[in-house]
Design a protein with these regions (language model features):
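Cytosolic-side transmembrane-helix boundaries in multi-pass membrane proteins
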Residues: 1-40, 214, 218-223, 227-235, ...
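Extracellular/periplasmic helix-loop junction at the C-terminal end of a transmembrane helix
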Residues: 143-181, 212, 332
């Protein structure tokens, strides 16, 4: 009986300790978030000091968004798609066709490309949502290759192997001023960063919502989620569709980066690159795919300037990461800095 007050006192002490631990973790996450956005905002100023250039940072943002789109489905729902390059390419072609044939409007091109890719993904998702595992992945590859060969063969519309060109991103008229995103690389970087921030905010909002928690429940145990009455197929279809919209959005931005769209953007090898970025960075973390894209794009840019066989070195790097950092680069960093 004399020990009871000690136990009670211990419990009282445990409460503030838990609160302070939670506050410390929250403060750490906030500090990391501030560091990430500060680095992105100041990238045009510090990348040249490291031998980089502004356009490289722009490519990192766009491909990082594409990798995060794949991870939205793979990392948080547990569904692997090897055909996401199809929506990336459709977004690029949709944006390019608007700028080339319809109207000289950058926002309209982005909107049209995003809508085209997202709706195409929604239709396909409704057809294959009951497939799982390798069957789902193979069906997405097959449909992706269908779109690839359409773009490759329909040369009168898509330009065939040469791609859709020429079209150019147009200046943005912001009331009293005009932002020249065609000739000013820094201005274009900040425009892409703004678009990137909108997509990231939307992803974060969805993942923090009840729907996002349901996605995680399906990832962890689909059978249990189904037993609890969750309409699994509906949630997977919605997650797949949202992922396709984000991917098409990234594809639209990529068309603006290059001022052309070509069939290679729809090829399954491009899907493999996106999955590789997500896995290298850490596919069960929100920011991991962006880190993977940074490593992939910078490594590719450097090695390709030395040898045309840069894919060999990228593959070797990927194998090393998978063997020694199974949770990705970000996962390894978290383990090392964790108290």
């Amino acid at each position: 009986m004399k020990d009871l007050p000690k136990l009670k006192s211990g419990r009282k002490l445990a409460v503030p300790v838990a609160i302070w631990t939670a506050k410390l973790e929250s403060g750490r996450k906030l500090a990391v978030l501030v560091a990430i956005w500060t680095a992105l905002v100041l990238a045009p100023f510090w990348t040249p000091l490291l031998g980089g250039y502004t356009a490289l940072g722009t490519r990192v943002l766009v491909l990082g968004l594409a990798a995060m789109s794949v991870n939205f489905l793979l990392g948080f729902t547990g569904v692997l798609s090897f055909g996401h390059a199809a929506w990336f390419g459709i977004g690029a072609y949709g944006c390019g066709m608007i700028l080339k044939f319809v109207a000289l409007s950058t926002p309209l091109g982005i909107f049209a490309g995003t809508l085209a890719g997202g709706l195409a993904g929604a239709v396909l998702g409704a057809l294959i949502v009951r497939r799982r595992g390798v069957y789902f992945a193979m069906v997405t590859i097959a449909f992706g290759q269908v779109f690839y060969y359409i773009a490759f063969q329909w040369s009168s519309v898509t330009g065939g192997d040469d791609g859709l060109r020429p079209f150019y991103r147009q200046p943005l008229h912001l009331g009293v001023t005009t932002l020249d995103i065609l000739n000013n690389a820094v201005a274009f970087y900040y425009f892409v960063l703004f678009c990137f921030a909108l997509a990231v905010a939307a992803m974060a909002f969805i993942l923090r919502s009840p729907f996002g928690r349901t996605m995680l429940a399906i990832r962890e145990n689909e059978r249990r989620a189904r037993f609890l009455g969750i309409p699994v197929e509906l949630h997977i279809w919605i997650a797949f569709t949202l992922s396709c919209f984000f991917m098409a959005y990234a594809g639209s931005l990529y068309a603006l980066v290059n001022n052309f769209a070509d069939p290679r953007g729809l090829h399954y090898s491009q899907s493999g690159d996106f999955v590789m970025m997500a896995v290298m960075g850490g596919m069960r973390s929100f920011w991991g795919p962006l880190l993977g894209a940074i490593v992939f794009v910078v490594f590719q840019d450097y090695v390709s300037s030395v040898t045309i066989n840069w894919q060999i070195f990228i593959g070797f790097l990927f194998v090393l990461v998978v063997l020694f950092f199974p949770r990705g680069i970000l996962g390894a960093i978290r383990r090392r800095v964790a108290p």
